[in-house]
């Protein structure tokens, strides 16, 4: 029996339990909330994610897994869903104790067994075939119910690629699907930090040349054996953390490629990737510019 679970990494002021089972899909190797049996958990701490569907899904899953009388302790930054937490939990029929701390709202509830609406929240936030997208995806996954404009730009400008390659930050597999249209591609590693993205990609990309890895690109081992890499690296709102992520992707791509191998990269126009590309690659060619995005082909 799992006794204590944790979802995400709450700030230390909330005293996250050290020995709890981690259940965040964004932490490779963690246990999936979905895999926990009903009523098998004594206490749960959830650092609630910012998306509404994703958050209600995580809360409903945690409540489902809790035993009656078990405690759910949830917090979120005020402007990242925290101010809606209490209402959302009350909508499940729970009595909620709310406090404010460190720009967060924290809610404590005890499972009664009479909660309502858990199944509906789980269905709305689960992996699903997205209408109009013709793909499987899940709320919380990057651009989960649409084709990202940056990836679309890259897909439109890339030539047919050849040999062994990887898609760093593959999401639910939109770009990889286009890459695999080239018959000269012999293998493609789809890699993402988000388990939900990797699971969706596995369903979307049914191709014997594809393999799937739930991993952090920054800590991948690089063998320098790939012919090509495509990537629409994480950027979010262009904060400094995101910029560093993109820079780490570029460096890792250079390590993973063989000499002469090529990286096809799309970045938000405001992100200054040029210096990092020039430092890690022999030749960097702008490959298009439009719609707020810049494309690059970089050769090792
Ligand atoms: C801009 S999105 C591109 C997704 C996909 N190519 C698409 O077009 O839908 C970047 C992806 O990188 C993933 N990601 C973020 N940090 C990562 C990391 N450290 N290692 C691997 N993937 C990461 C995100 O989960 C997200 O799916």
Walk through the language-model features, giving the residues of each:
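Conserved S-adenosyl-L-methionine
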Residues: 94-103, 136-138, 283-291
